[in-house]
């Protein structure tokens, strides 16, 4: 539901998600074609919540239901991943992976899941030029290349010391190609005219 972000605040819903992950691992964990399971896709943490101005970008359709909406904290996300790992790994051999999304906080995972027990964890990062723009990247070819070479590449290289890293999503959508400042990927669908 647009503008409603309260799942992590509801223990029953969190437990339901963990139970679904456990059932998926139990059912598919030994399948030859399975690479791994990712517990969450793009959990929105505090910095991204602020960068993307979520409550304005995705205005709540139901204001009452949206009351109390908030980003997922890193503390919650770390605990969720630990719990999910324990539930998933009980049904999967070590050659299957648990893939954790970085929550758009690529550099925040250096001290996490470094014990031998977690040798089959992969860190997934999703990179979008529109997010780089929202964080101040110059809207020029030179600006995009500088961002990739001087920020993104060194960060991924650094994090590869701690985890195998995959870039599970990458999008080149950008303001330069659109011919106008999209303010970090906004459009007429968000009420922003180009």
Please place each PLM-identified region on the residue numbering.
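Active-site region of glycoside hydrolase catalytic domains
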Residues: 2-179
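C-terminal/domain-terminus segments
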Residues: 176-194
């Amino acid at each position: 539901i647009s503008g409603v972000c309260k799942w992590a605040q509801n223990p029953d819903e969190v437990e339901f998600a963990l139970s679904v992950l456990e059932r998926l691992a139990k059912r598919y964990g030994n399948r030859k074609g399975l690479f791994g399971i990712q517990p969450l896709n793009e959990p929105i943490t505090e910095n991204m919540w602020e960068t993307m101005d979520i409550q304005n970008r995705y205005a709540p359709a139901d204001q009452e239901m949206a009351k109390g909406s908030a980003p997922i904290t890193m503390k919650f996300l770390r605990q969720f991943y630990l719990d999910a790992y324990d539930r998933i790994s009980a049904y999967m051999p070590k050659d299957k992976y648990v893939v954790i999304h970085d929550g758009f906080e690529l550099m925040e995972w250096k001290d996490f899941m470094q014990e031998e027990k977690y040798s089959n964890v992969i860190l997934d990062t999703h990179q979008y030029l529109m997010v780089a723009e929202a964080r101040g990247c110059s809207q020029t070819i030179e600006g995009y290349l500088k961002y990739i070479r001087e920020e993104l590449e060194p960060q991924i290289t650094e994090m590869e010391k701690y985890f195998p890293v995959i870039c599970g999503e990458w999008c080149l959508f950008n303001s330069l190609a659109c011919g106008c400042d999209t303010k970090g990927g906004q459009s007429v669908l968000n009420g922003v005219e180009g």
